[in-house]
């Protein structure tokens, strides 16, 4: 493969790899920002819950006394410990999903190269199929032309063989058989023309 063709074949893979690398860098940065934001939001919500728990805990006796009075009971029964304090939320830190940018770029470049090789192989297979199809078409045309010729030879041989055999086997009353004349003919002897030897 010539160098320009090699560069042209490798260019999409390299460009795809670089794009994947920088794309993964952007994704990682966005994931990190999102994780920081989620952590801050979770911590703020946890702080609000702790404040609410503290308020509930600080007002436990007052709430219990009010509840007892509303129920028509003596407020002094609050000496038992106060109303229960519900549990609140806890802050959680979010983890960012981080991917290896270089791996993404290499993987994309490798996949692009494999795709290029696969396309090239398929193109060659299509060229081979086209060549085979052309050969089969040519063979079919040759066979079509030979079949009538072969049929004609077969018909000729079938129809004229008996006639030829009779001519060869005829006996001339004044001379030898024609088949014997063939055997006696000398290789350098020229046929007769007007009763004279043609030289």
UniProtKB/Swiss-Prot annotation:
One GO term describing the cellular component: viral capsid
Function: Probably triggers with protein G the injection of the phage DNA into the host upon conformational changes induced by virus-host receptor interaction.
Keyword Methyltransferase among record annotations: no
S-adenosyl-L-methionine found in the keyword field: no
Keywords: Capsid protein, Host-virus interaction, Viral genome ejection through host cell envelope, Viral penetration into host cytoplasm, Virion, Virus entry into host cell
Name used for this protein in its record: Minor spike protein H
Subcellular location: Virion
Region (Disordered): 171-199
Alphabetical GO biological process terms: symbiont entry into host cell
Family: Belongs to the microviridae H protein family.
């Amino acid at each position: 493969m010539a160098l320009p063709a090699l560069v042209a074949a490798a260019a999409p893979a390299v460009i795809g790899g670089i794009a994947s690398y920088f794309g993964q860098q952007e994704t990682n940065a966005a994931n990190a920002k999102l994780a920081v934001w989620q952590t801050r939001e979770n911590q703020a919500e946890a702080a609000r819950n702790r404040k609410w728990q503290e308020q509930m805990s600080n007002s436990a006796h007052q709430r219990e006394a009010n509840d007892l009075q509303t129920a028509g009971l003596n407020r002094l029964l609050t000496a038992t410990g106060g109303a229960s304090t519900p549990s609140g939320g806890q802050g959680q830190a979010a983890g960012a999903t981080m991917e290896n940018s270089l791996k993404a770029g290499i993987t994309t470049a490798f996949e692009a190269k494999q795709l290029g090789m696969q396309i090239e192989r398929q193109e060659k297979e299509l060229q081979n199929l086209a060549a085979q199809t052309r050969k089969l078409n040519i063979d079919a045309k040759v066979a079509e032309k030979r079949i009538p010729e072969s049929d004609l030879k077969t018909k000729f041989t079938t129809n004229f063989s008996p006639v030829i055999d009779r001519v060869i086997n005829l006996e001339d009353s004044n001379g030898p058989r024609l088949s014997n004349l063939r055997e006696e003919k000398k290789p350098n002897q020229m046929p007769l023309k007007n009763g004279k030897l043609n030289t």
